UniProtKB/Swiss-Prot annotation:
GO molecular function: ATP binding; sulfate adenylyltransferase (ATP) activity
Lineage: Bacteria, Pseudomonadati, Pseudomonadota, Gammaproteobacteria, Vibrionales
Function recorded in the entry: With CysN forms the ATP sulfurylase (ATPS) that catalyzes the adenylation of sulfate producing adenosine 5'-phosphosulfate (APS) and diphosphate, the first enzymatic step in sulfur assimilation pathway. APS synthesis involves the formation of a high-energy phosphoric-sulfuric acid anhydride bond driven by GTP hydrolysis by CysN coupled to ATP hydrolysis by CysD.
A Pfam family per the record: PAPS_reduct
Database matches in NCBIfam families: CysD (TIGR02039), PRK05253.1 (NF003587), PRK12563.1 (NF009214)
Protein name: Sulfate adenylyltransferase subunit 2
Matches recorded under PANTHER family: SULFATE ADENYLYLTRANSFERASE SUBUNIT 2 (PTHR43196:SF1)
Gene Ontology BP term (one): hydrogen sulfide biosynthetic process
Family: Belongs to the PAPS reductase family. CysD subfamily.
Gene that specifies this protein: cysD
Assigned EC number: 2.7.7.4
Record organism: Vibrio atlanticus (strain LGP32)
Reaction(s) catalysed by this chain's protein: sulfate + ATP + H(+) = adenosine 5'-phosphosulfate + diphosphate
Biological or metabolic pathway of the protein: Sulfur metabolism; hydrogen sulfide biosynthesis; sulfite from sulfate: step 1/3
């Protein structure tokens, strides 16, 4: 990797660490969202660097939908034990009681109940006034126009037409009681940046990002992995073993794999250098209606 590229990644690293430290100093009760994916892994690594050799001074929060890949949950618990950070796990109790499922209730309702409402419950329960997220501007058009410090009102809603100006590296974190800020330290990173940084820093990731033979079914133009016996097959669907990996991770019935032979980090980086589509194309929740992601973000989704 050439020196110019290394310098670019160091600049991104420095910017993100600056943002993380600013939030820790400025807010009374911040939290870092931990979705277990590649961006969360990078953000956690940056937080550890920001306060090394001390402990991360805020907890991590995982909003568990009960439908994540098994390997994600295993990785989450293993990582928490390895680094000893304070991990909070929240499941929407109403959603669990009603048996909320992407198969029964559909992607939109499942996401709203288990992710959006679950997140708002957790933020209210613990009284967090700032929440870090790993979203990047290159992922999706509604995220492209969101600020690094993204203001949320008392109902956790976002108004894209009423965002605060951000001049250079000056961020406005003033909030009234009950209001909060969503903070995105990786805003200026790209998917390629993330993978090159993971490679350079030897950051652990969920094995699902690497190609392997996995059982999948083709549904709505996506390859859905059969992760457990709750998978409901539709008429005519056949489970096949294919060499696939995931560019993005979420609830397994709503996350599409891509056919790939990239079973190493260098292989993934080589794929990223020629990729022409966003990783979010593999997320069913982004396509369940027009303007889907922006609508979800307005309602309180990350």
């Amino acid at each position: 990797m050439d020196q110019e590229r290394l310098t670019h990644l160091k600049q991104l690293e420095a910017e993100s660490i600056h943002i993380i430290r600013e939030v820790a100093a400025e807010f009374d009760n911040p939290v870092m969202m931990y979705s277990i994916g590649k961006d969360s892994s990078v953000m956690l690594h940056l937080a550890r660097k920001a306060f090394y050799p001390g402990k991360i001074p805020f907890p991590l929060l995982h909003v568990d939908t009960d439908w994540k890949f098994r390997e994600m949950i295993e990785f989450r618990d293993r990582t928490a034990e390895k680094y000893g950070f304070d991990l909070l796990v929240h499941k929407n109790p109403e959603g669990i009681e009603m048996g909320c499922s992407p198969f029964v209730h559909g992607s939109s309702k499942h996401t709203d109940i288990m992710k959006t409402q679950g997140l708002k419950q957790a933020l209210n329960k613990y009284g967090f006034d700032a929440a870090f997220g790993g979203a990047r501007r290159d992922e999706e058009k509604s995220r492209a126009k969101e600020r690094v410090y993204s203001f949320r009102d008392k109902n956790h809603t976002w108004d894209p037409k009423n965002q605060r100006p951000e001049l250079w590296h000056t961020y406005n974190g003033q909030v009234n009681k009950g209001e909060s800020i969503r903070v995105f330290p990786l805003s200026n990173w790209t998917e390629l940046d993330i993978w090159q940084y993971i490679y350079l820093e030897s950051i652990d990731i969920v094995p699902l990002y690497l190609s392997d033979k996995r059982p999948v079914v083709e549904r709505d133009g996506m390859l859905i992995m059969v992760d457990d016996d709750r998978m409901e097959l539709q008429e005519g669907e056949v489970i096949e073993e294919k060499s696939v990996r995931f560019r993005t991770l979420g609830c397994y019935p709503l996350t599409g794999a891509v056919e790939s032979e990239a079973n190493t980090l260098t292989g993934i980086i080589e794929e990223m250098l020629v990729a022409t589509s966003s990783e979010r194309q593999g997320r069913a929740i982004d396509h369940d209606q027009s303007g889907s992601m922006e609508l979800k973000k307005r309602q309180g989704y990350f």
